[in-house]
């Protein structure tokens, strides 16, 4: 008997590259299922439990992981992030944002049909976005993210070539809307070719 696999469009990119904007553009297609990740980190200002993340205690997260209820888990600083299996829909295309470690875990999971989208923009563009998106930006945190991204994505590029690469620098919403449609259609074609 053939097992149904989770079809996942995994969006990946450095900080302030436009991952969340692309996710929202893709999610305008109601036939898709948005993945809401779990995390042990505390919510940031304005984040809502169950919308931005499922905020969990370390104990609850570890229990879910030990019970085999997490599809992928990654560790960053003192926090854990992951995708709960019960947060996926086997009958729909699932779409979410993942870090390189999460992508590698998904690549190794035979329950998943993966389509990876790499979102990129120049360091200058990302820095300007980082400074503009917060009222009082934490410059130390921005620098830390940039250094971490540099290391993570250098390693990632050596082991995986994305299915789709999108440069978001200097583009408008209409371009992103068109790219979002193209990504979904290309992912569907990709999976159809794999089954033939």
Regions of interest found by a model, annotated:
Residues 28-36:
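Post-Walker A helix-loop "phosphate-sensing" segment adjacent to the P-loop in P-loop NTPases
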């Amino acid at each position: 008997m053939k097992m149904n696999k989770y079809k996942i469009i995994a969006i990946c990119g450095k900080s302030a590259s436009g991952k969340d904007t692309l996710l929202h553009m893709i999610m305008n297609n109601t036939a898709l299922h948005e993945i809401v990740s779990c995390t042990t980190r505390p919510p940031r200002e304005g984040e809502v439990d169950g919308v931005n993340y499922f905020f969990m205690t370390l104990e609850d997260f570890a229990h879910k992981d030990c019970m085999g209820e997490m599809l992928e888990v990654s560790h960053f600083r003192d926090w854990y992030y992951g995708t709960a299996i019960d947060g996926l829909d086997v009958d729909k295309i699932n779409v979410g944002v993942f870090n390189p470690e999460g992508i590698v875990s998904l690549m190794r999971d035979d329950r998943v049909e993966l389509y990876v989208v790499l979102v990129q923009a120049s360091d200058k563009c990302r820095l300007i976005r980082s400074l503009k998106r917060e009222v009082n930006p934490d410059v130390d945190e921005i620098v830390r993210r940039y250094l971490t991204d540099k290391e993570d994505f250098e390693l990632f590029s050596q082991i995986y070539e994305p299915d789709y690469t999108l440069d978001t620098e200097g583009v408008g919403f209409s371009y992103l809307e068109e790219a979002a449609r193209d990504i979904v259609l290309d992912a569907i074609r990709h999976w159809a070719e794999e089954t033939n």
